[in-house]
UniProtKB/Swiss-Prot annotation:
PANTHER family listed in its UniProt record: N-SUCCINYLARGININE DIHYDROLASE
Disulfide linkage: none
UniProt source species: Sphingopyxis alaskensis (strain DSM 13593 / LMG 18877 / RB2256)
Descriptive protein name: N-succinylarginine dihydrolase
Enzyme class: hydrolase
Active-site residues (renumbered): E161, H229, C346 (nucleophile)
Length: 415
Protein backbone atom coordinates (compact mmCIF):
# COMPACT_ATOMS: atom_id res chain seq x y z
CA UNK A 1 0.00 0.00 0.00
CA UNK A 2 1.37 3.40 -1.00
CA UNK A 3 1.96 5.88 1.80
CA UNK A 4 4.11 8.95 2.34
CA UNK A 5 7.39 8.25 4.14
CA UNK A 6 9.56 11.10 5.37
CA UNK A 7 13.27 10.29 5.15
CA UNK A 8 15.26 12.61 7.41
CA UNK A 9 18.96 13.25 7.03
CA UNK A 10 20.84 12.29 10.19
CA UNK A 11 22.94 15.34 11.05
CA UNK A 12 26.57 14.37 10.62
CA UNK A 13 29.50 14.69 13.03
CA UNK A 14 31.10 17.47 10.92
CA UNK A 15 28.17 19.89 11.39
CA UNK A 16 29.74 23.35 11.54
CA UNK A 17 29.03 27.02 10.84
CA UNK A 18 31.27 28.09 7.96
CA UNK A 19 28.69 30.39 6.32
CA UNK A 20 29.02 28.72 2.93
CA UNK A 21 25.53 29.24 1.52
CA UNK A 22 25.19 32.52 -0.39
CA UNK A 23 21.63 33.80 -0.24
CA UNK A 24 20.93 31.88 2.98
CA UNK A 25 20.58 34.58 5.64
CA UNK A 26 20.76 32.24 8.64
CA UNK A 27 23.90 30.56 7.32
CA UNK A 28 25.61 33.91 6.77
CA UNK A 29 24.58 35.36 10.13
CA UNK A 30 25.98 32.39 12.07
CA UNK A 31 29.24 32.07 10.12
CA UNK A 32 32.11 31.51 12.53
CA UNK A 33 29.95 30.37 15.43
CA UNK A 34 30.83 27.26 17.41
CA UNK A 35 28.53 24.41 16.37
CA UNK A 36 27.25 21.53 18.48
CA UNK A 37 27.15 18.42 16.26
CA UNK A 38 25.99 16.09 19.03
CA UNK A 39 23.11 18.34 20.07
CA UNK A 40 22.23 18.95 16.42
CA UNK A 41 21.95 15.24 15.61
CA UNK A 42 19.96 14.53 18.77
CA UNK A 43 17.55 17.35 17.88
CA UNK A 44 17.03 15.76 14.47
CA UNK A 45 16.45 12.34 16.04
CA UNK A 46 13.93 13.85 18.45
CA UNK A 47 12.04 15.32 15.49
CA UNK A 48 11.86 11.86 13.94
CA UNK A 49 10.60 10.43 17.25
CA UNK A 50 7.98 13.18 17.40
CA UNK A 51 6.66 12.28 13.96
CA UNK A 52 6.64 8.56 14.74
CA UNK A 53 4.49 9.30 17.80
CA UNK A 54 2.09 11.19 15.51
CA UNK A 55 1.76 7.94 13.54
CA UNK A 56 3.73 9.10 10.50
CA UNK A 57 6.01 6.62 8.67
CA UNK A 58 9.64 7.65 9.11
CA UNK A 59 12.90 6.80 7.40
CA UNK A 60 16.40 8.28 7.39
CA UNK A 61 19.59 8.74 5.40
CA UNK A 62 23.06 8.52 6.91
CA UNK A 63 25.66 11.31 6.72
CA UNK A 64 28.08 11.32 3.80
CA UNK A 65 31.80 10.71 4.31
CA UNK A 66 33.22 14.09 5.30
CA UNK A 67 35.65 15.76 4.92
CA UNK A 68 35.57 14.76 1.25
CA UNK A 69 39.21 13.91 0.59
CA UNK A 70 38.68 12.63 -2.99
CA UNK A 71 37.02 15.93 -3.92
CA UNK A 72 39.97 17.87 -2.55
CA UNK A 73 42.36 15.52 -4.36
CA UNK A 74 40.56 16.29 -7.62
CA UNK A 75 41.34 19.94 -6.86
CA UNK A 76 45.01 19.10 -6.39
CA UNK A 77 45.06 19.45 -2.63
CA UNK A 78 44.27 17.63 0.62
CA UNK A 79 42.44 18.16 3.90
CA UNK A 80 45.70 19.18 5.54
CA UNK A 81 46.93 21.52 2.77
CA UNK A 82 43.71 23.01 1.40
CA UNK A 83 42.99 26.72 1.58
CA UNK A 84 40.50 27.57 4.29
CA UNK A 85 37.47 28.02 2.05
CA UNK A 86 38.09 24.73 0.23
CA UNK A 87 38.65 22.87 3.48
CA UNK A 88 35.35 24.20 4.84
CA UNK A 89 33.55 23.12 1.67
CA UNK A 90 34.99 19.62 2.05
CA UNK A 91 33.87 19.39 5.69
CA UNK A 92 30.27 20.50 5.08
CA UNK A 93 27.55 18.36 6.66
CA UNK A 94 24.91 19.88 4.37
CA UNK A 95 23.66 16.49 3.14
CA UNK A 96 21.60 16.55 6.37
CA UNK A 97 19.03 18.58 4.40
CA UNK A 98 17.45 15.64 2.62
CA UNK A 99 14.93 17.86 0.85
CA UNK A 100 17.82 18.63 -1.51
CA UNK A 101 18.77 14.98 -2.03
CA UNK A 102 16.44 14.34 -4.96
CA UNK A 103 13.19 15.15 -6.71
CA UNK A 104 10.58 12.42 -6.25
CA UNK A 105 7.61 11.59 -8.49
CA UNK A 106 5.31 8.93 -7.03
CA UNK A 107 4.22 5.96 -9.13
CA UNK A 108 0.64 7.20 -9.77
CA UNK A 109 2.05 10.23 -11.64
CA UNK A 110 4.43 8.41 -13.97
CA UNK A 111 3.57 6.75 -17.27
CA UNK A 112 5.45 3.55 -16.33
CA UNK A 113 3.90 3.21 -12.87
CA UNK A 114 7.23 3.53 -11.07
CA UNK A 115 8.34 5.93 -8.36
CA UNK A 116 11.07 8.05 -9.95
CA UNK A 117 13.88 9.79 -8.06
CA UNK A 118 16.46 12.09 -9.67
CA UNK A 119 19.40 12.92 -7.43
CA UNK A 120 20.00 16.69 -7.27
CA UNK A 121 23.23 18.04 -8.77
CA UNK A 122 23.38 21.06 -6.39
CA UNK A 123 25.87 22.73 -8.73
CA UNK A 124 25.20 26.31 -7.59
CA UNK A 125 27.03 25.95 -4.27
CA UNK A 126 30.55 24.45 -4.25
CA UNK A 127 30.12 22.88 -0.80
CA UNK A 128 27.07 20.94 -2.04
CA UNK A 129 28.15 20.21 -5.60
CA UNK A 130 30.05 17.10 -4.52
CA UNK A 131 27.20 15.55 -2.50
CA UNK A 132 25.42 13.76 -5.31
CA UNK A 133 27.71 10.70 -5.77
CA UNK A 134 27.31 9.69 -2.11
CA UNK A 135 23.62 10.53 -2.13
CA UNK A 136 23.05 8.55 -5.32
CA UNK A 137 24.74 5.49 -3.81
CA UNK A 138 22.44 5.73 -0.82
CA UNK A 139 19.30 6.20 -2.93
CA UNK A 140 20.19 3.21 -5.08
CA UNK A 141 20.58 1.09 -1.96
CA UNK A 142 17.43 2.28 -0.19
CA UNK A 143 15.27 2.13 -3.33
CA UNK A 144 16.72 -0.88 -5.15
CA UNK A 145 13.32 -2.54 -5.58
CA UNK A 146 11.90 -2.62 -9.14
CA UNK A 147 9.10 -0.32 -7.95
CA UNK A 148 11.63 2.54 -8.16
CA UNK A 149 13.67 4.16 -10.90
CA UNK A 150 16.64 6.13 -9.54
CA UNK A 151 18.25 8.56 -11.98
CA UNK A 152 21.68 10.25 -11.99
CA UNK A 153 21.79 14.05 -11.77
CA UNK A 154 20.78 16.45 -14.50
CA UNK A 155 24.02 17.55 -16.22
CA UNK A 156 25.67 20.82 -15.29
CA UNK A 157 25.26 23.74 -15.74
CA UNK A 158 21.51 23.27 -15.23
CA UNK A 159 21.15 23.76 -11.49
CA UNK A 160 18.82 21.42 -9.62
CA UNK A 161 18.21 21.59 -5.87
CA UNK A 162 15.77 18.69 -5.54
CA UNK A 163 12.47 18.46 -3.71
CA UNK A 164 12.94 21.85 -2.02
CA UNK A 165 11.67 23.37 -5.29
CA UNK A 166 8.98 20.78 -6.01
CA UNK A 167 5.43 20.38 -4.72
CA UNK A 168 2.62 17.92 -5.38
CA UNK A 169 -1.15 18.30 -5.13
CA UNK A 170 -3.43 15.25 -4.98
CA UNK A 171 -6.61 13.95 -3.41
CA UNK A 172 -4.54 11.34 -1.55
CA UNK A 173 -0.88 10.39 -1.59
CA UNK A 174 -1.71 7.16 -3.45
CA UNK A 175 -3.75 8.96 -6.13
CA UNK A 176 -2.60 10.64 -9.32
CA UNK A 177 -1.43 14.17 -8.65
CA UNK A 178 -0.32 17.45 -10.16
CA UNK A 179 3.40 18.14 -9.81
CA UNK A 180 4.60 21.72 -9.47
CA UNK A 181 8.20 22.60 -10.28
CA UNK A 182 9.25 26.03 -8.99
CA UNK A 183 12.23 27.67 -10.67
CA UNK A 184 14.13 30.92 -10.37
CA UNK A 185 15.57 33.37 -12.88
CA UNK A 186 19.12 34.65 -12.37
CA UNK A 187 19.98 38.31 -12.15
CA UNK A 188 19.86 39.50 -8.56
CA UNK A 189 22.28 39.73 -5.67
CA UNK A 190 21.51 36.16 -4.63
CA UNK A 191 21.57 33.23 -7.08
CA UNK A 192 18.48 31.49 -8.46
CA UNK A 193 19.42 27.91 -7.68
CA UNK A 194 16.72 26.00 -9.58
CA UNK A 195 16.93 26.25 -13.37
CA UNK A 196 13.84 25.81 -15.53
CA UNK A 197 15.73 23.52 -17.93
CA UNK A 198 16.64 21.22 -15.04
CA UNK A 199 13.04 21.04 -13.87
CA UNK A 200 11.79 20.25 -17.37
CA UNK A 201 14.44 17.55 -17.78
CA UNK A 202 13.32 15.88 -14.55
CA UNK A 203 9.67 15.96 -15.61
CA UNK A 204 10.58 14.25 -18.89
CA UNK A 205 12.74 11.65 -17.14
CA UNK A 206 9.97 10.89 -14.67
CA UNK A 207 7.51 10.39 -17.55
CA UNK A 208 5.00 12.86 -16.16
CA UNK A 209 1.81 13.86 -17.94
CA UNK A 210 2.38 17.39 -19.32
CA UNK A 211 -1.24 18.24 -18.55
CA UNK A 212 -0.57 17.55 -14.86
CA UNK A 213 2.84 19.18 -14.65
CA UNK A 214 3.32 22.88 -13.90
CA UNK A 215 6.41 25.09 -14.04
CA UNK A 216 5.98 28.21 -11.92
CA UNK A 217 8.50 30.97 -11.40
CA UNK A 218 9.55 31.77 -7.87
CA UNK A 219 9.30 35.41 -6.90
CA UNK A 220 12.56 37.27 -7.30
CA UNK A 221 11.49 39.30 -4.29
CA UNK A 222 11.46 36.08 -2.26
CA UNK A 223 14.85 34.92 -3.56
CA UNK A 224 16.50 38.27 -2.89
CA UNK A 225 14.83 38.35 0.52
CA UNK A 226 16.56 35.11 1.49
CA UNK A 227 14.14 32.42 0.27
CA UNK A 228 16.86 30.48 -1.51
CA UNK A 229 14.47 27.54 -2.05
CA UNK A 230 10.73 27.54 -2.67
CA UNK A 231 10.17 25.53 0.52
CA UNK A 232 11.09 28.64 2.50
CA UNK A 233 7.90 30.36 1.24
CA UNK A 234 5.49 27.56 0.24
CA UNK A 235 4.63 23.95 1.04
CA UNK A 236 1.93 21.61 -0.30
CA UNK A 237 0.28 18.48 1.03
CA UNK A 238 -2.51 16.53 -0.68
CA UNK A 239 -5.10 19.17 -1.72
CA UNK A 240 -3.61 22.06 0.32
CA UNK A 241 -1.10 24.69 -0.76
CA UNK A 242 0.21 26.76 2.17
CA UNK A 243 2.02 29.79 0.80
CA UNK A 244 3.18 33.32 1.46
CA UNK A 245 1.69 36.08 -0.65
CA UNK A 246 5.11 36.83 -2.17
CA UNK A 247 6.08 33.23 -3.05
CA UNK A 248 5.50 33.40 -6.81
CA UNK A 249 6.60 35.98 -9.38
CA UNK A 250 3.10 36.33 -10.85
CA UNK A 251 0.85 35.40 -7.95
CA UNK A 252 -2.49 35.64 -9.73
CA UNK A 253 -1.33 33.70 -12.79
CA UNK A 254 0.30 31.03 -10.62
CA UNK A 255 -2.83 30.54 -8.53
CA UNK A 256 -5.00 30.40 -11.66
CA UNK A 257 -2.73 27.83 -13.28
CA UNK A 258 -2.75 25.69 -10.15
CA UNK A 259 -6.55 25.88 -9.84
CA UNK A 260 -6.99 24.95 -13.50
CA UNK A 261 -4.77 21.88 -13.15
CA UNK A 262 -6.16 20.83 -9.76
CA UNK A 263 -9.59 22.39 -9.14
CA UNK A 264 -9.90 20.87 -5.65
CA UNK A 265 -6.92 22.83 -4.34
CA UNK A 266 -7.29 24.84 -1.13
CA UNK A 267 -4.81 27.70 -1.15
CA UNK A 268 -4.04 28.91 2.36
CA UNK A 269 -2.20 32.16 1.78
CA UNK A 270 -0.50 34.24 4.44
CA UNK A 271 -0.73 37.93 3.48
CA UNK A 272 2.39 40.06 3.72
CA UNK A 273 0.38 42.58 5.73
CA UNK A 274 0.01 39.98 8.51
CA UNK A 275 3.39 38.24 8.27
CA UNK A 276 6.17 40.04 6.44
CA UNK A 277 8.48 38.13 4.12
CA UNK A 278 11.31 38.86 6.55
CA UNK A 279 9.39 37.31 9.46
CA UNK A 280 8.37 34.34 7.33
CA UNK A 281 12.01 33.67 6.45
CA UNK A 282 13.42 34.32 9.92
CA UNK A 283 10.87 32.00 11.55
CA UNK A 284 10.86 29.44 8.72
CA UNK A 285 7.08 29.36 8.95
CA UNK A 286 6.80 27.67 5.55
CA UNK A 287 9.75 25.34 6.06
CA UNK A 288 7.36 23.28 8.14
CA UNK A 289 6.25 19.75 7.43
CA UNK A 290 2.62 19.96 6.35
CA UNK A 291 1.37 16.46 7.13
CA UNK A 292 -1.82 14.44 6.97
CA UNK A 293 -2.55 13.08 10.45
CA UNK A 294 -3.74 9.47 10.85
CA UNK A 295 -6.82 10.64 12.77
CA UNK A 296 -7.71 13.04 9.94
CA UNK A 297 -6.95 16.65 9.19
CA UNK A 298 -3.57 18.25 8.69
CA UNK A 299 -0.90 19.58 10.99
CA UNK A 300 2.21 21.73 10.72
CA UNK A 301 5.47 20.48 12.25
CA UNK A 302 7.14 23.86 12.75
CA UNK A 303 10.43 25.13 14.14
CA UNK A 304 10.16 26.62 17.62
CA UNK A 305 11.29 29.91 16.05
CA UNK A 306 7.80 30.19 14.53
CA UNK A 307 6.29 30.00 18.02
CA UNK A 308 8.73 32.68 19.20
CA UNK A 309 7.86 35.15 16.43
CA UNK A 310 4.68 36.94 17.62
CA UNK A 311 3.35 37.96 14.20
CA UNK A 312 3.74 34.41 12.91
CA UNK A 313 2.27 32.65 15.93
CA UNK A 314 -0.66 35.06 16.20
CA UNK A 315 -1.55 34.38 12.57
CA UNK A 316 -1.23 30.62 13.04
CA UNK A 317 -3.41 30.58 16.14
CA UNK A 318 -6.10 32.54 14.31
CA UNK A 319 -5.87 30.10 11.39
CA UNK A 320 -6.36 26.90 13.37
CA UNK A 321 -9.52 28.12 15.12
CA UNK A 322 -11.06 28.79 11.73
CA UNK A 323 -12.63 26.25 9.42
CA UNK A 324 -9.52 25.64 7.34
CA UNK A 325 -7.77 22.37 6.54
CA UNK A 326 -4.76 22.91 8.86
CA UNK A 327 -5.90 22.21 12.41
CA UNK A 328 -2.85 21.45 14.58
CA UNK A 329 0.55 23.02 15.28
CA UNK A 330 3.57 21.05 16.49
CA UNK A 331 6.66 23.15 17.31
CA UNK A 332 9.94 21.18 17.33
CA UNK A 333 13.43 22.26 18.36
CA UNK A 334 15.92 21.99 15.48
CA UNK A 335 17.88 25.13 16.41
CA UNK A 336 21.27 23.80 15.38
CA UNK A 337 20.00 23.11 11.86
CA UNK A 338 18.04 26.37 11.79
CA UNK A 339 21.20 28.35 12.53
CA UNK A 340 22.62 27.00 9.28
CA UNK A 341 19.41 27.75 7.36
CA UNK A 342 17.50 24.46 7.49
CA UNK A 343 14.13 23.92 9.19
CA UNK A 344 12.01 20.78 9.70
CA UNK A 345 11.10 20.50 6.00
CA UNK A 346 14.72 20.91 4.86
CA UNK A 347 15.69 17.87 6.90
CA UNK A 348 13.33 15.47 5.14
CA UNK A 349 12.67 13.95 1.72
CA UNK A 350 9.10 12.84 1.06
CA UNK A 351 8.77 9.53 -0.78
CA UNK A 352 5.38 8.00 -1.58
CA UNK A 353 5.96 4.25 -1.63
CA UNK A 354 4.94 0.91 -0.20
CA UNK A 355 7.21 0.53 2.86
CA UNK A 356 7.65 -3.14 1.93
CA UNK A 357 9.60 -2.05 -1.18
CA UNK A 358 12.11 0.07 0.77
CA UNK A 359 15.33 -1.43 2.17
CA UNK A 360 14.30 -1.87 5.82
CA UNK A 361 17.67 -0.65 7.06
CA UNK A 362 16.54 2.88 6.11
CA UNK A 363 13.21 2.72 7.96
CA UNK A 364 12.95 4.03 11.51
CA UNK A 365 11.27 2.74 14.63
CA UNK A 366 11.79 3.69 18.27
CA UNK A 367 14.39 0.99 18.87
CA UNK A 368 16.44 2.00 15.85
CA UNK A 369 16.30 5.67 16.80
CA UNK A 370 17.51 4.68 20.28
CA UNK A 371 20.43 2.89 18.63
CA UNK A 372 21.27 5.91 16.47
CA UNK A 373 21.03 8.26 19.45
CA UNK A 374 23.37 6.00 21.41
CA UNK A 375 26.02 6.19 18.68
CA UNK A 376 25.62 9.96 18.44
CA UNK A 377 25.90 10.44 22.21
CA UNK A 378 29.08 8.37 22.28
CA UNK A 379 30.88 9.43 19.10
CA UNK A 380 29.66 12.84 17.80
CA UNK A 381 31.78 15.85 18.79
CA UNK A 382 30.22 18.14 21.36
CA UNK A 383 31.48 21.28 19.61
CA UNK A 384 33.34 22.38 16.49
CA UNK A 385 34.91 25.83 16.15
CA UNK A 386 36.06 27.10 12.73
CA UNK A 387 39.73 26.52 13.58
CA UNK A 388 38.99 22.88 14.44
CA UNK A 389 38.56 22.03 10.75
CA UNK A 390 42.36 21.95 10.49
CA UNK A 391 42.63 19.37 13.29
CA UNK A 392 43.91 15.94 12.30
CA UNK A 393 42.53 14.52 15.55
CA UNK A 394 39.04 15.79 14.76
CA UNK A 395 39.31 14.40 11.23
CA UNK A 396 39.98 10.90 12.58
CA UNK A 397 37.28 11.27 15.24
CA UNK A 398 34.51 12.19 12.80
CA UNK A 399 35.46 9.39 10.43
CA UNK A 400 35.30 6.87 13.29
CA UNK A 401 31.97 8.33 14.38
CA UNK A 402 30.38 7.83 10.96
CA UNK A 403 31.73 4.29 10.65
CA UNK A 404 30.31 3.47 14.08
CA UNK A 405 26.88 4.61 12.87
CA UNK A 406 27.12 2.57 9.67
CA UNK A 407 28.12 -0.47 11.69
CA UNK A 408 25.19 0.00 14.09
CA UNK A 409 22.77 0.18 11.15
CA UNK A 410 24.34 -2.69 9.17
CA UNK A 411 25.16 -0.24 6.36
CA UNK A 412 28.90 -0.76 6.21
CA UNK A 413 28.79 -1.00 2.41
CA UNK A 414 28.31 2.79 2.44
CA UNK A 415 31.66 3.21 4.19
Amino acid sequence: MLTEINFDGIIGPTHNYAGLSRGNIASASHAGDVSQPRAAALQGIDKMRHNLVLGLPQGFFVPLDRPDAPWLAALGTSVEKAEGHLRAQAWSASSMWAANAATVSPAPDSADGKCHLTVANLVTMPHRSHEWPGTLAQLRLAFAHPAFSVHPPVPAPFGDEGAANHMRLCSGHDRVGVEIFVYGVAGGRFPARQHLDASKAIARRHRLDPARTLFIRQSDTAIQGGAFHNDVVAVANEHVLFTHETAFEDREAAHAEIRAAFPAVEIVEVPASAVSLAHAIKSYLFNAQLVTLPEGGMGLVLPTEAHETPAVWNWLEAMIVGNGPIRRLFPVDVRQSMANGGGPACLRLRVVADPATVDPRFLADEAKLDRIAGVVAKHWPEAIAPADLASTTLLHDVRRARLALLDALDLSELG
